A protein has these predicted regions:
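A short, flexible loop at the N-terminus of ABC-type nucleotide-binding domains that lies
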Residues: 1-4, 9-23, 28
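ABC-family P-loop ATPase nucleotide-binding domains
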Residues: 11, 70-123, 127-128
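ABC ATPase nucleotide-binding domain signature region
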Residues: 31-32, 43-93, 172-182
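The feature captures the beta-strand-to-loop junction immediately N-terminal to the Walker
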Residues: 35-37
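Hydrophobic anchor residue at the start of the ABC signature
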Residues: 121, 138, 149
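Catalytic Walker B motif of ABC-type/P-loop ATPase nucleotide-binding domains
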Residues: 132-136, 141
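H-loop/switch region of ABC-family ATPase nucleotide-binding domains
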Residues: 164-165
Length: 183
């Protein structure tokens, strides 16, 4: 089942005009990449799809469980401690495939930004969401971590939304793209 936005309008408080105006868009199963210049509304659109923001007008039909991985790698996932205690096959597989040590969730604040980002994605995937929304997932990670991340994201079978300036990732992961311009 897709995420469907119908005639959505959104403006931040004190804005002189809406950032998003009368947008209708369907995020189908598979990966949709959001492209556009900085400040054009990609992250805002992703947050609307995730349910972190609500539109002033229009409707959004969301899936039962949507996982959000923010651009800020230092934002610890809500289920981080649950993942730290989990040793089910999926948790073990994600730790192995993303080269995450068992103690890393317990020392999240001391990890590098790249390790934090991998943990954000691992926790999100471990929760088996219907939709996964990622904002700049390859920022702060090295080439090997990027490859690991791509491999686990390619296995995701739900509705995926990817905000990124990483053209190679977009080309390898994206099934479709939505391009945005400011104004």
């Amino acid at each position: 089942m897709p995420i469907v936005l119908s005639d959505v309008t959104f403006a931040y408080p004190r804005a002189t005009k809406p950032l998003i105006h009368n947008l209708s868009l369907t995020f189908a199963i598979g990966w949709t990449c959001l492209l556009g210049d900085n400040g054009c509304g990609k992250t805002t659109l992703a947050k609307l799809a995730a349910g972190l923001l609500e539109p002033q007008q229009g409707t959004i039909q969301r899936l039962d469980y949507v996982a959000w991985c923010p651009q800020d790698p230092q934002q610890a996932p809500e289920a981080l401690l649950d993942f730290a205690c989990a040793y089910d096959p999926l948790a073990r597989s994600l730790r192995s495939r993303l080269a995450l040590q068992d103690d890393m969730p317990w020392r999240f604040a001391q990890l590098s930004c790249g390790e934090q980002k991998k943990l954000q994605v691992a926790v999100a995937l471990w929760q088996q969401p219907d939709a996964l929304i990622l904002d700049e997932p390859t920022n702060h990670i090295d080439h090997q971590a990027r490859r690991q991340l791509l491999e686990v994201l390619q296995q995701f079978k739900g509705t995926g939304i990817l905000v990124s300036h990483d053209r190679q990732l977009l080309g390898l992961l994206g099934n479709r793209c939505a391009c945005f311009e400011q104004g």
